[in-house]
Amino acid sequence: MKVLRDRETGTSRGAGRRPRRKREAKKTTLKKFRRRIPLYLSLTAMGSVLAGLIFTGALSVQGASLTDAIKDRFAFSGYLQSTYRQSVHKENPLAAIQRVGLETRFNQGSWIRGFASGYVDTDLSVTGRWHSREPVVTPEVGEAYLTIDTHYADLIVGMQQIRWGEADALSTFDLINPIDYRNPIATGRSTQRLSVGAADLRVSLKGLGLLDLICVPFPRFSRLAEYGSPWEDKGLRELRHYVGEGLVGRKYDNGPFEPEFAGRLKFFQSGYDLAFMFFKGYEHKPLYTAGIDYQNMSATIHETYKTFEAFGLSSAVSILKSTLRTEFTLRHNYPFQSDDIDIERRNDYEAIIGWDRMFLTNLNVNLQTFFSSYDGKKVRGKDRERYGATWSVSDKYLDDALTAGVRGEYFANNDDACVEVFGEYEYDDHLRFTAGYMFFSGGKSNDLGQYDKNDHFYFGVKYSF
């Protein structure tokens, strides 16, 4: 059984379950609060630092008001965005999201900078899914960090998106930021990611390259689709059903969790980049083992998180008008989820080769092939070899105001696929329109094939201010 983690247990609507549901709801709320303590602490500390900088900066401005000081040091912007996604197989929409987003940039002289972004989503489509436990309103922090800039090194502290992969779309080394499974599909060949609270030290190697050292003191784990969501994983839905019917119990791993560490040594010359990378941390989606609760004499599913190490090598080479990108990664002792509801460790080898080129004026072609394989005995439910391709082809029209194209990914080992036809029109510097069609294919139990009922059209408008 392929399962994922969630804190909200889906239960049947039969009689006699309500008291247990209330107790589990209280436990769930407490567990959610505990898991979010690192995020709350980091945001509180960051807010205190920003407030202190505003105060001290204002005092240092002679003959100027506090308002003038804030205007000199801060730049504010935001946007209003509306997105509608309608499945061609379902009556109810997949999403009808109204988003309000805000961003701010801060500068204190030349040595310290700050950036913060966040948004609030109101998804009106949730009201049409009567059995769903999705929230209608969802606030989210995008990124919020401070940068201390010196001549030889930069220190970046706060909530960040850290993407080290050289290859576009799929990457073997985007391991630091967990996938947001509440809405996992960003485009036809990329995933949504969550920011993490990290300290990132970047040391310049006198023009030869860069040394990047990262510590994530409180690991952040993937958020999963709520009960009844159109993006709810099939295995997760089954687990919730079994727990709700009282067929199995469920235990959670609430830590404490070890800090995560990563490092990158990158050399760059004209037309050539080479990087060596290291990661020691968690598989951010939950893993499950089955056992027996001898006190209650019942079957129990235990949710846990396991660590592993990864070593990688990446390069980017410019050849004529093209760029060739490669990534090779060893995920040492990686924890695979078995269909036997157990965790099996293997060494997993991954490789990506990508090529992109700009033809004519604006015709962009980006192709990628990937291959991965693990050693040892076969893990039940996991293909030993995974391979396929991703692509993106786009061009610009109407004086470069309209970008249109097609992008997607195909896993040849199991026929999983996601393809998106997309268009984006920039009316002016403030107003932007998007439209497209996305479809999925593959086996009903595959990662992408399970969403074949989510084939959909989408339309969006975004106004920036």
Please identify what each model-predicted range represents.
Residues 66-88, 106, 113-116, 404:
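Transmembrane beta-strand segments of Gram-negative outer membrane beta-barrel proteins
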Residues 74, 110-114, 152-155, 208-211, ...:
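Repeated loop/turn-to-beta-strand initiation elements of outer-membrane beta-barrel proteins
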Residues 82-88, 120-124, 150-152, 161-163, ...:
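Transmembrane beta-strands of outer-membrane beta-barrel pores
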Residues 100-106, 143-150, 199-203, 263-267, ...:
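Residues on the lipid-exposed face of transmembrane beta-strands in outer-membrane beta-barrel proteins
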Residues 105-231, 270, 442:
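Outer membrane beta-barrel
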Residues 181, 439, 452-465:
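Outer-membrane beta-barrel "beta-signal"
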Residues 281, 316-338, 342-409:
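Detector for outer-membrane/organellar transmembrane beta-barrel domains
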